[in-house]
């Protein structure tokens, strides 16, 4: 009977891992693509294209195939009190859970702005998807351009 009350042991784990330290955040800030709107900033780094050195934290963390995304949340005290900051973090985590297939292979850092606290979940989701799709489109366009070779005159 006690086993019936417990949660299932094979409950799926979250499809993302979090960025752990300053060096990981700095790598996304410096090498990643930035996109801003009036509610938050999103920094995206294609972690699958990072060099696979042994000491590279992205390579070590993404070799587990179940953890296909790295997520970092940087919510400052300017956004609101602790309750509001935690609400924003919960919403952003659930967005990454809900749209895990779009985030696959990326390291994401969200930096919410003060106006983000007044958004409801559906509006936040709309802005998140618009930003992520535009970033992926830009990265694909940029990738196609760099792989093109030209004949020498």
Swiss-Prot record:
It is an enzyme of class 3 (hydrolase). Pfam families: Ribonuclease_P. One of its GO terms (biological process) is tRNA 5'-leader removal. GO terms for cellular component: ribonuclease P complex. Its EC number is 3.1.26.5. Keywords: Endonuclease, Hydrolase, Nuclease, RNA-binding, tRNA processing. Disulfide bonds: none annotated. The keyword Ribonucleoprotein does not apply. One of its GO terms (molecular function) is ribonuclease P activity. SUPFAM superfamilies: Ribosomal protein S5 domain 2-like. It catalyses: Endonucleolytic cleavage of RNA, removing 5'-extranucleotides from tRNA precursor. It comes from the Bacteria. InterPro entries: Ribosomal_Su5_D2-typ_SF, Ribsml_uS5_D2-typ_fold_subgr, RNase_P, RNase_P_CS. RNaseP catalyzes the removal of the 5'-leader sequence from pre-tRNA to produce the mature 5'-terminus. It can also cleave other RNA substrates such as 4.5S RNA. The protein component plays an auxiliary but essential role in vivo by binding to the 5'-leader sequence and broadening the substrate specificity of the ribozyme. Belongs to the RnpA family. Consists of a catalytic RNA component (M1 or rnpB) and a protein subunit. This is Ribonuclease P protein component. The gene is rnpA.
